Amino acid sequence: MSSAGVALSPVRSEPLIMPLVRANSCLDSYPDDTIMIYLTLPGSVIPMRVLESDSIESVKLRIQSYRGFVVRNQKLVFGGRELARSNSNMRDYGVSEGNILHLVLKLSDLQVLDVKTTCGKHCRFHVERGRNIGYVKKQISKKRGDFVDPDEQEILYEGEKLEDQSLINDICRNDDSVLHLLVRRSAKVRVKPVEKNFELSIVAPQAKDKKGREAKSIVPPKKLSLEPVVVNSKAKVPLVVKDMIQSASDGLKSGNSPVRSSEGTGGAYFMQGPSGNKFVGVFKPIDEEPMAENNPQGLPLSPNGEGLKKGTKVGEGALREVAAYILDHPKSGNKSMFGEEIGFAGVPPTAMIECLHPGFNHPKGIKTKIGSLQMFTENDGSCEDMGPLSFPVEEVHKISVLDIRLANADRHGGNILMTKDESGKLVLVPIDHGYCLPESFEDCTFEWLYWPQARKPYSAETQEYIRSLDAEEDIDLLKFHGWKMPAETAQTLRISTMLLKKGVERGLTAFEIGTIMCRETLSKKSLVEEMVEEAQEAVLPGTSEAAFLEALSDVMDYHLDHSQEH
């Protein structure tokens, strides 16, 4: 995951009414379209006056001014939908008087810990906010061999013992946080804030010689399991996927619990390997997706089953994550024939699994969870962390091909990781595909549209890859792996693949094709949506899918040729 994580930020419990400030306006009078909305965060409701005509960007700027949350770190959710278009206004999204909006914040995922003893010994290490107390114990002992064994440590907060699964992000919330580390030889840890970090001072008597320490084995929970979900026994599972699943399973058996990430609007867990020194995968349970029954981030249940993005359903994100990996064919051909090769866009290996562990969010009792497991990618951050000018053109193009094909409704810089290959070249890795393959094009969003690389022509190699794509083969391949796509979703894949191939035939760039798919504003339909409506009007009711696609092909040819003439 990137170095930036998404979390529901802790706030003061008292409400704060954010004033509506306009030039030449009186403090006791407001424009006619003024409304009162309520921003909710854990433990807090914040009344806020806005105008129905205010843009989403301007509302976020006011939140930044009064609460200090940077605009790019904010997500607003209303009525089960993310207010993702910055230039759209509150009225466009149907926000009116008295409505409740959920504010999700992205914070730094790294916490610097300074550990000191009264005898002058000191060490410093970085801890991800998604790490737990058990990990902190191991790091303290590992950094300083004369510290107490992790098994001999107990950490209390406000008089209550913290379990090893407790997250740093959930504990270090208040400026006056004090942690007491109780060891068999009675040690204490006091935490005080130092700017954005925490400083830990440890008081402990001289530790015993390592040889004199009592060896303790880690005893994992009695009930735990991690197995692949196999729908078709004939479907070949790539070796890299088998190894990932085995490593995650061995990690659980070794007592290395899942570590919940503070990133994202749904539940996501870092799965550790048997050594406990590195992550091997990221598990996203279906029942913890945004607006699902057991979502741990405080989002409400979906009122109609629709996901945060139009054309998606709650609980189908894991299927789409796996589908993106399966359909990311390598340059040499269909992934069903060459399962061991890396896909053209580089989607990390992903599989559907079932896992039982008490470390997940189980408000109604511990049960087996089904979800997607994606290989963890070591990275240097995400594309949000730096400007796009340094991104290689081919790296941006490969992601654009994937997003256009799958009609991705949630491509932003935060879900494109940056890493380097063996030669030191920058490589972009696309992740988070739970909102691809929607049933409509309404929410298609491609951040790379605004990057200069998108205006460059596709290389001959990329064009050849695009020509090799076949939507019907893709639909059959997903069915072979266990997902019989809904008719609307299959139609989206056929249309987006058709547009991509026709666009490349005419020499269109990623920017030009992507612009056809994405709406300029929330209320103005995209050109591809208009093409679909035109084709639907040209055929009789009850017409076959093949006849509709033939009509759409003619409509698409006309619009693409006409646009080139101008």
Swiss-Prot record:
Residues 430-456 are annotated as: Activation loop. This is Phosphatidylinositol 4-kinase gamma 4. The keyword Protein transport does not apply. Residues 261-267 are annotated as: G-loop. Residues 34-111, 112-190 form the Ubiquitin-like domain. Belongs to the PI3/PI4-kinase family. Type II PI4K subfamily. Its EC number is 2.7.1.67. The gene is PI4KG4. Autophosphorylated. ATP binds at S262, E263, G264, T265, G266, G267, A268, K284, Q374, M375, F376, T377, D432. It is an enzyme of class 2 (transferase). Pfam families: PI3_PI4_kinase, ubiquitin. It comes from the Eukaryota. The keyword Transferase applies. Interacts with RPN10, UFD1 and CDC48 in vitro. GO terms for cellular component: membrane. Residues 250-263 have a biased composition (Polar residues). Residues 407-415 are annotated as: Catalytic loop. Keywords: ATP-binding, Kinase, Membrane, Nucleotide-binding, Phosphoprotein, Repeat, Transferase. Induction: By salt.
